[in-house]
């Protein structure tokens, strides 16, 4: 069974554009190898962190939205944890509500006054 996930991770700010793209591609391929589908990548760019993480005040924010089996998350997060380029990451399970068809309203009989 596949589930929708969202992963946000922060890359070190001292990475160049090419190194950042290589890191993004690396994690995208890792997810794809684990059976993920519908991978959407949003590069949020370099932003100031709310607090210092591993002696960095800025970071490159990357957001991934994808559909994957539950077994794909552990190896993906392990690779991020062991990586020097990722300073923080978070994966959440998304609850996407199924659209329910609108209820049809039954017509109520209207009272008609008879005129004589």
From Swiss-Prot:
The keyword RNA-binding applies. Residues 97-116 are annotated as: Disordered. InterPro entries: Ribosomal_bS6 (IPR000529), Ribosomal_bS6_CS (IPR020815), Ribosomal_bS6_sf (IPR035980), Ribosomal_S6_plastid/chlpt (IPR020814), Transl_elong_EF1B/ribsomal_bS6 (IPR014717). Keywords: Ribonucleoprotein, Ribosomal protein, RNA-binding, rRNA-binding. GO terms for biological process: translation. Pfam families: Ribosomal_S6 (PF01250). It comes from the Bacteria. GO terms for cellular component: cytoplasm; ribonucleoprotein complex; ribosome. Residues 97-110 have a biased composition (Basic and acidic residues). PROSITE patterns: RIBOSOMAL_S6. One of its GO terms (molecular function) is small ribosomal subunit rRNA binding. The keyword Coiled coil does not apply. NCBIfam families: S6. Belongs to the bacterial ribosomal protein bS6 family. HAMAP family: Ribosomal_bS6. Binds together with bS18 to 16S ribosomal RNA. PANTHER family: MITOCHONDRIAL 28S RIBOSOMAL PROTEIN S6, SMALL RIBOSOMAL SUBUNIT PROTEIN BS6M. This is Small ribosomal subunit protein bS6. It comes from Nostoc punctiforme (strain ATCC 29133 / PCC 73102).
